[in-house]
UniProtKB/Swiss-Prot annotation:
Belongs to the ABC-3 integral membrane protein family. The keyword Repeat does not apply. It comes from the Eukaryota. This is Uncharacterized membrane protein in ycf23-apcF intergenic region. GO terms for cellular component: ATP-binding cassette (ABC) transporter complex; cyanelle membrane. SUPFAM superfamilies: ABC transporter involved in vitamin B12 uptake, BtuC (SSF81345). It is a multi-pass membrane protein. It is found in: Plastid, Cyanelle membrane. PANTHER family: ABC-TRANSPORTER METAL-BINDING PROTEIN, IRON TRANSPORT SYSTEM MEMBRANE PROTEIN HI_0360-RELATED. GO terms for biological process: response to zinc ion; transmembrane transport. The lineage of its organism: Eukaryota, Glaucocystophyceae, Cyanophoraceae, Cyanophora. It holds the Pfam family ABC-3. It comes from Cyanophora paradoxa. Keywords: Cyanelle, Membrane, Plastid, Transmembrane, Transmembrane helix. Its main location: plastid.
Amino acid sequence: MLIDYLFRLPLNILFLFSHSFSSFLLPFQLHFMQRAFVIGLIAALLAGIVGSFLMLQRLTLLSDAISHSVLPGLAIAFSFGIPLIFGALLASIISVIIINWIRTESRLKEDTAIGIVFASFFGLGILLISVIQKENKVDLNHFLFGNILGITSEDLQNTSIILAIILLFFISCYRQLKCYTFDPIMAQTIGLPINFLQSTFLILVALTIIVSMKAIGVILVLALLVTPGATGLLIGKSLEYVILTSSIIGVSCSFSGMLLSYLFNIPPGPTIVLITSLIFFILFLIINKKDSTTDSKLF
């Protein structure tokens, strides 16, 4: 009996390994998971690129306002049967215009204007979606927390177009945007189109948020925009390195988060966000420890 068991042990181990490996490969063979992986990776890549500039320009709060301001646009677009991307983009542009209008026409500071618009648009969006939910049986959670596993081929096509537009802008205007990001006064002095750069960048932020919403929803989209960029700033010594690092971190976390969500039957959006946050805190503690050790050696 013992000899027979020892003889079969390698075969049993091989069977368990092959079964586990086939379970691991199963998500990549399903069409809806393939679309989910592509959308998630594109969203993470764009968030890493755009988020790096957001962090350096200190526009984190504005991006949060834009992400929550798209809700009314989503609700209205859904009601009239038009593509959600157009409603979300229009709502985000209107929110930015209103923020700038309040800031320039009153003594209120930008953060106050952002808070007012953020709360107003988000409240209106929740109200409209709640009404639509009763009439059309739409799940509110899909808007708030994303529905990456319900992505269609049309969503994939729209996302690919957005990716091409954003990459084209950053490739063609990278030097100008870099100059404006680090020194707006010098950029204005040398005659760079400041208004064009700022307006176009905010529109691209809105497009990135719309893409990311499919992956993790309105509530958590700020984490995907900010956390990889913040992690890149911790270890990056140049803008190019920060963009590269944040993009790699975002893509890796998106891939692993979706894979874990399928294997353990947990929501993909929160899983992606938690992984990115975990990586940030681990690197933060490591770098902090190194800095404190270096400082202690100096005295």
